[in-house]
């Protein structure tokens, strides 16, 4: 039967043989005329009821006590290929009620939907009740941890459940979904939404665990999304120039951003005000265009926080690139921000047209250009060494294609270098290549592979490789560096050590449909984990 006709048989009560009265615990009622056959075919609960020797089996009028009359009505309408949704519940509550009702009717429940809803703090107990009903496993326990308020009263929970929650891997990745632009959190086993709507199109984003805020930019605007109350504040750059990149300061109190024409600004994302702006080439304060803003001072930044294509914070310094032949190191001191004459500007004929990739390890700056790799001391700006990049790229690959380049640190002596589809683990102090992995050959079955990013997570000791190809789409692989002796070069590489159990797709494929942008984090839910750890120690 055509589903439209089937739907009409329901809505117009054609040939119905059962008047079904749904009743909830508050004695609210809802009456629908249905067909026993349709209910029996689609639902084991009704099949058992109508085919058994129960008092109600042969009745034409039936009263049924259900968890929620509106949601059960929606489920029954779904049997007739006429999906409807009760509008008076927020999405998160509706989906939880739907799972409860599906469980009541002995229907298969779709736990995946829980990955995509945002449960507010006051709704956590409802989530807990729902999961308690459907059962605990690694997925549902991870969802509990991900949604639990940091200050939740742990005495409400069984001690064994708390132990299982403490064993859930820390959530170490925040990313933007390639499918719908929402932000998600993942820990390698599971991922779930932390925003319900699209927040970002292009540009960088930062995450402040202290303030529970996501900061991102698009064109001339900076957006601050509050994860606790689900609100967004917007700031527009006063000079109406595109914001090129943003960096969160290590104290997580400010954003430093750069915008054309060569202006670096310190921005308070709580008050949504610019603290100070300076013209990068001279260090001069730019205050005539901020007449309504009282200028303050830059605080001292103690350590590296982040590296972006245009901006790098190094201790108390900001390294900013405005073209490939001009690397300007800005020095942030207590009450000023000025170009440091000692550092000056580096002009090198070896740095050709194309992007420059920079990383920092303690007191060494690594600069990867299309020709050479430089090892620079930031205090004197001396070259410790300079090596040719010939060993870092596959000769079948054009080295000038700069979209395929990246660099990151593994430990004090070892860095990961990506050029094209060739990933090199390199001990720079020993000047030795530990291992080289051709991502195209090992992971993409010889098909064209585009590598977008490599990131190392020192907490989990995982090197993440973000790549995509025409066959399998976008993937993120994680390489466990513990499997490699970083002091001993591997001469005859056995790629079997990088088989699927060593380079694995990040997360559960059913949870992650695609990642547009991602950031490795180590502090999401850290307060909750600390509270759980203390509670377990006090209740041994």
Swiss-Prot record:
It is found in: Membrane. It is a single-pass membrane protein. InterPro entries: BTB/POZ_dom, SKP1/BTB/POZ_sf. The keyword Cell division does not apply. The chain crosses the membrane at residues 356-376. Keywords: Membrane, Transmembrane, Transmembrane helix. One of its GO terms (cellular component) is membrane. Signal peptide: none annotated. It comes from the Viruses. Residues 16-88 form the BTB domain. Pfam families: BTB. Belongs to the mimivirus BTB/WD family. This is Putative BTB/POZ domain-containing protein R224. The lineage of its organism: Viruses, Varidnaviria, Bamfordvirae, Nucleocytoviricota, Megaviricetes.
